[in-house]
């Protein structure tokens, strides 16, 4: 899988993404249902993620997890646990959680998918993707994430926060700020596919 690793900045200690999701996008017009149509060219990880999330092609999990392990993990220190980012869309099977478990299996590292608790957005508020700037996103996310004390033993752990898409970084920042309040997490690194 061809990747172009990029460092990402935020409230985490280290952060990287594998590649851009979409390399190019050409507007084709409006279809018969009134939807805008695009001819998208995705990166290899971007196409794998698209197939996983929108075509339910679960065979993409192993190659994506293997690519994260091979390319991104050597850039981080020792990882003690993996925390998938909370999903923004409810699905019967959450792609980021499944990816975290596939990566955890490859690394022999525990996954804590219930550690981050996301409060629902206030009724009538716009979706995060419809907000226009980082300040609006930060305001919409303020106070929405709390920590479930899921680590049952003593100690301090280095966590890898895993997400599929990285845009402005507002959500990952809000989650990392919440993680900083949890005494059992020493530091948090961030990884995303795109």
Predicted features by range, described:
Residues 1-78, 89, 120-151, 155:
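Active-site-facing substrate-recognition patch
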Residues 1-16, 173-194:
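PRPP-dependent phosphoribosyltransferase catalytic core
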Residues 70, 101, 105, 177-181:
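Short, well-ordered alpha-helices that flank and scaffold nucleotide-derived cofactor binding pockets
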Residues 83-86, 111-125:
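A short, structured active-site edge motif that brings together acidic residues
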Residues 86-95:
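Glycine-rich phosphate-binding loops at beta-strand->alpha-helix junctions
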Residues 96-112:
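Glycine-rich phosphate-binding loop and adjoining helix at the ATP-binding site
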Residues 142-150, 157-161, 174-182, 189-190:
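Long C-terminal interaction/binding lobes of large macromolecular proteins
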Residues 165-175:
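Acidic, divalent-metal-coordinating active-site segment for phosphoryl/phosphodiester hydrolysis
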């Amino acid at each position: 899988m061809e990747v172009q690793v990029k460092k990402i900045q935020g409230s985490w200690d280290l952060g990287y993404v594998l590649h851009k999701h979409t390399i190019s996008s050409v507007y084709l017009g409006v279809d018969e249902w009134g939807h805008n149509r695009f001819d998208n060219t995705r990166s290899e990880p971007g196409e794998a993620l698209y197939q996983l999330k929108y075509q339910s092609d679960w065979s993409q999990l192993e190659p994506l997890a293997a690519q994260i392990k091979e390319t991104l993990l050597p850039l981080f220190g020792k990882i003690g646990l993996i925390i998938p980012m909370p999903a923004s869309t409810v699905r019967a099977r959450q792609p980021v959680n499944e990816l975290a478990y596939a990566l955890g299996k490859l690394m022999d590292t525990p996954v804590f998918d219930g550690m981050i608790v996301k409060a629902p957005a206030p009724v009538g508020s716009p979706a995060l993707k419809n907000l226009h700037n980082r300040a609006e996103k930060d305001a919409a996310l303020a106070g929405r994430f709390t920590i479930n004390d899921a680590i049952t033993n003593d100690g301090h752990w280095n966590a890898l926060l895993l997400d599929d898409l990285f845009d402005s970084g507002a959500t990952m920042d809000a989650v990392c700020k919440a993680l900083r309040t949890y005494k059992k997490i020493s530091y948090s690194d961030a990884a995303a596919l795109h």
